[in-house]
Structure formats: structure tokens, C-alpha cells
A protein has these predicted regions:
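Membrane-interface helix-loop-helix modules in multi-pass membrane proteins
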Residues: 15-19
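Contiguous transmembrane helix-bundle modules in multi-pass membrane proteins
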Residues: 23, 29-189
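Short hydrophobic alpha-helical segments that form membrane-spanning helices or hydrophobic packing faces
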Residues: 13-14, 176
């Protein structure tokens, strides 16, 4: 669960990579490196044999936090890029292309879930239910971005929506995956 950032931070991080500037490069390199270290077993095994302090002991679960961190920082750069594009009214094409690709991704996943049924029914029900909210968040934000092409003053509403949608999505994910003890067990009276 340490790698979860939400659908809009991922969108904004990709946007930051598309509009990449020199100051974003260290976070792109950190994100790619952390992802490779966390998901490439031969590389983890090799680093473990080197007996380097911290690096040899770092398990994939700890390294993935660096990926989440870099994705979050890139999302903040992407948000700046989005606001700049919407205020200056140029480079709409990159945002439209990225939104279109994300829309194709969402439609593809829904088609796979409904028609190909790649998993047992009990898992399929959970997968569909878990994909509803990210789809709604994405469509809502995309609608506001498209609306901002016509109404410039809606940018503040977009910022508020992205903040609330990401916060709610993170809270929902946390409550779902992190165990919490009942209050009476933690604070006995």
C-alpha cells in the first residue's frame, strides 16, 4: 500500500514528465530507479550481495516509498504545468492527448472487466467495485479541465477538486488497507 498515490497524482506526474524541465529530472531518475530496485529481483539480489549499509538491507517495500515520493513531487510539478497551460491558454494539445490516453485506459479496463472476465467472479466483483471511484474522479476532473478551456476562472475549482478527490481517495485507500484497532483496545478506560 506504500505505493498508492491516486489517479490524479499519477495523471499530473505524467504531465510533469511530458513538460519535463531540468528541475524535474532528479525526481524522474529517482522514480525510475526506485521502481527498478523494487521490482527487479536480480538487481535486488545483486545489491544484497554487495553488503552496502542501508542499500543491502533495504527491501522492496522500503524502496517503493522513494517511488511514491518522486511521483508525488512530480505531481506537484505537473499541477504547476496544468495551471500554467490553463492560464496562458497554450499547449492544450498535450493535455488533451494525455486525457485521451487515460480515457482509453479506463475504457479498456472496463471492457476487459465486463467482457473478457480475466479472473474468478468473486474477484471480478471486487475489481469492478474498486474501479468505480477512480473512474468517477478521473471523469469529474477531466470535465472541469475541459470546462476551463471555456471559462478561465474555474481553475480554482479545479485545484479544489483535485485536492479533495486525491485526499478522499487516499483516505479511502488507507481505511481499506491499513488495520485500525478499536478505540477501546488502544485506550482502555
Amino acid at each position: 500500500w506504500a505505493s498508492f498515490v491516486g489517479i490524479w497524482p499519477v495523471f499530473l506526474a505524467i504531465l510533469a514528465i511530458i513538460f519535463a524541465r531540468r528541475k524535474q529530472l532528479p525526481f524522474i531518475v529517482l522514480g525510475v530507479s526506485a521502481l527498478l530496485l523494487a521490482t527487479c529481483p536480480p538487481l535486488i539480489t545483486f545489491l544484497g550481495t554487495l553488503k552496502l549499509p542501508i542499500i543491502s538491507n533495504a527491501v522492496a517495500g522500503r524502496i517503493i516509498i522513494l517511488f511514491s515520493f518522486s511521483l508525488t513531487v512530480l505531481a506537484s510539478f505537473g499541477f504547476d504545468d496544468l495551471v500554467e497551460v490553463l492560464e496562458k491558454r497554450k499547449n492544450f494539445k498535450k493535455i488533451i492527448i494525455l486525457s485521451g490516453l487515460m480515457l482509453i485506459f479506463f475504457v479498456s479496463v472496463w471492457l476487459i472487466l465486463f467482457f473478457l472476465k480475466p479472473m474468478p467472479t468473486q474477484w471480478l466483483i471486487v475489481a469492478k467495485r474498486n474501479f468505480i471511484l477512480p473512474t468517477v474522479f478521473f471523469l469529474g476532473g477531466t470535465f472541469l479541465i475541459v470546462l476551463s478551456f471555456k471559462f478561465k476562472k474555474i481553475i480554482i475549482l479545479i485545484a479544489l477538486y483535485l485536492l479533495l478527490a486525491t485526499s478522499f481517495d487516499s483516505l479511502r485507500f488507507t481505511r481499506k488497507w491499513m488495520p485500525f484497532d478499536p478505540r477501546n483496545l488502544v485506550y482502555p478506560e
